[in-house]
Amino acid sequence: NSAAIFNFSYERYDWVRPGIMLYGISPFADKNGVDLELQPVMHVVSRLISVKQLRQGESVGYGATWQCPEDMQVGILSLGYGDGYPRLAASGTPFLVRGQRCALIGRVSMDMIAIDLRRCPDAGVGEAVTVWGQDLPVEEIARHVGTIAYELVCNMPLRAPYIWQE
């Protein structure tokens, strides 16, 4: 397996089964793939479908579990648990907008996620948002969700459009 490849010498063997490292993902709980000089093979991107200015105290998401600590801009992503994003991801789980970390706020719904855009006040509808990939390791998202990266990459359904590149 991938962990064994990193931890043991294989000069005397004819074959190995690399597993998760083929995705560019670390097999170790305390490391990301880039720490091991692996390149992620999956870059998941969504887009902002709405940007709203909310007032301090307004609630976001099902069950009103998150309230705006101040007047702020909130973005809505076209992404949810129906697209393979983990429903149990908590507020604070990171996304990247223009290279800036923006936190998930409220609950993940089937088709949408709300994010805090205070770090990217100029972000607008159509803006690309990195869910995970080169600059936001899937291992980090998995740690926020309390799962493993393998589960996240294997749960991406065909409902989400795939763009294959070499």
Curated annotation (Swiss-Prot):
Pathways per UniProt: Amino-acid biosynthesis; D-alanine biosynthesis; D-alanine from L-alanine: step 1/1
Keywords attached to this entry: Isomerase, Pyridoxal phosphate
Example GO BP: D-alanine biosynthetic process
Residues that bind substrate: M110
GO molecular function: alanine racemase activity; pyridoxal phosphate binding
Active-site feature positions: Y62 (proton acceptor)
UniProt EC number: 5.1.1.1
Cofactor(s) recorded in Swiss-Prot or TrEMBL: pyridoxal 5'-phosphate
First-level EC class: isomerase
Reaction it catalyzes: L-alanine = D-alanine
Stored Pfam families: Ala_racemase_C, Ala_racemase_N
Cellular component GO terms, alphabetical: cytosol
Cited function: Catalyzes the interconversion of L-alanine and D-alanine. May also act on other amino acids.
NCBIfam families found in the cross-reference section: alr
Similarity annotation: Belongs to the alanine racemase family.
Protein name: Alanine racemase
Organism: Piscirickettsia salmonis
Gene: alr
